[in-house]
A protein has these predicted regions:
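Acetyl-CoA-dependent GNAT
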Residues: 12, 75-80, 85-98, 102-187, ...
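Conserved acetyl-CoA-binding loop-helix of GNAT-fold acetyltransferases
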Residues: 188-193, 197-214, 233-237
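Conserved catalytic-core motifs of GNAT/GCN5-like acyltransferases
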Residues: 9-10, 41, 128, 138-144, ...
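Conserved GNAT acetyl-CoA-binding A-motif
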Residues: 212-224
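Cytosolic, low-complexity regulatory segments enriched in Ser/Pro/Gly with interspersed Lys/Arg
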Residues: 1-53
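Hydrophobic adenine-recognition pocket in adenosine-nucleotide-binding enzymes
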Residues: 59, 189-191, 224
Length: 278
């Protein structure tokens, strides 16, 4: 089941089409091919590859810096999304903030201060979203993302892939096996913001599904705190079904102080794709 065996190597080819995004369409941009060996493309072969073709291959040590950059930038994007857009997913918090604003008026009798109250609340949400997400990012960068080779490439049942376009790493995804549940967990999926909308994320997701099927796992699971609807549509287009949801999820690195609980809330959604009956 080790991911470095020839049977588990993926030289997935993606014809990058700007119009083929994550939506399920009849036009399929992903061409699957099984290479005769696990050797990476040599420079001569790489020159023959069109610039709009992406190859998905296993992680190599030289990818570490770019992989961490893509992961870092992808997580940092969640700060404003969680602080502002995420508020629409928290009706109880909206009610509480409205109540605080009304209380401000009754206590101060100042229209100006009352008008400033929502801005202060939003500023506090941004501050605590940044604080919590940076703490989470620090935890990740000092655990599995600190040594991808040791954490994902060496253990049985785990693997890490990168999507490469014109010699540049543009996307990442990991698979972590859970033998006790006979499932693979899809983790760390992210695509460079400059290359989104080309079907790369969908191809990375399919690579994890292919890995799970080849190794006879019963299902693939994932958990996401993504606020954007596009991320959830991506998982659903791959065949995942929602199995649960937590409205007040605790991220690693959270202190759960009263102020943090007041100004930071995040929804965690769990998905599962059943590959076969056990």
């Amino acid at each position: 089941m080790h991911c470095s065996s020839p049977k588990m190597v993926c030289e997935t080819k993606i014809v990058a089409d700007e119009h083929d995004a994550i939506h399920g369409t009849k036009k399929e941009s992903i061409l699957w091919s099984s290479p005769p060996s696990s050797a990476p493309l040599n420079p001569a072969e790489a020159k023959d590859v069109r610039k709009d073709v992406v190859f998905i291959r296993e992680f190599e040590r030289g990818d570490q810096e770019e992989v961490r950059r893509i992961f870092y930038e992808g997580i940092m994007e969640r700060i404003p999304n969680t602080a502002f857009r995420g508020l629409w997913q928290q009706p109880k918090t909206q009610f509480l903030y409205a109540l605080l604003t009304i209380m401000c008026f009754y206590m101060t009798k100042s229209v100006m201060l009352t008008c400033c109250a929502p801005l202060i609340l939003m500023g506090a949400r941004y501050y605590y979203s940044r604080k919590v997400i940076q703490n989470y990012l620090d935890c990740a960068l000092h655990t599995d993302m600190a040594d991808i080779d040791a954490y994902y490439m060496k253990p049985t049942g785990s693997c890490f892939w990168v999507a490469v376009l014109d010699g540049r790493v543009v996307g990442i995804v990991a698979a972590q096996g859970h033998e006790d549940e006979n499932t693979v967990e899809l983790r760390r999926m992210s695509v460079d913001s400059r290359y989104r909308g080309k079907g790369i994320a969908k191809a990375l997701g399919r690579r994890v599904l292919e890995y799970a099927m080849r190794n006879n796992y019963a299902g693939v699971v994932l958990g996401t705190t993504a606020v954007k609807l596009a991320a959830h549509k991506l998982y659903e287009s791959l065949g995942f079904r929602r199995t649960g949801q937590s409205e007040d999820y605790r991220l690693p690195g959270m202190s759960r102080s009263p102020l943090e609980r007041l100004f930071f809330q995040i929804r965690h959604t769990r998905y599962r794709l059943q590959l076969r009956e056990e």
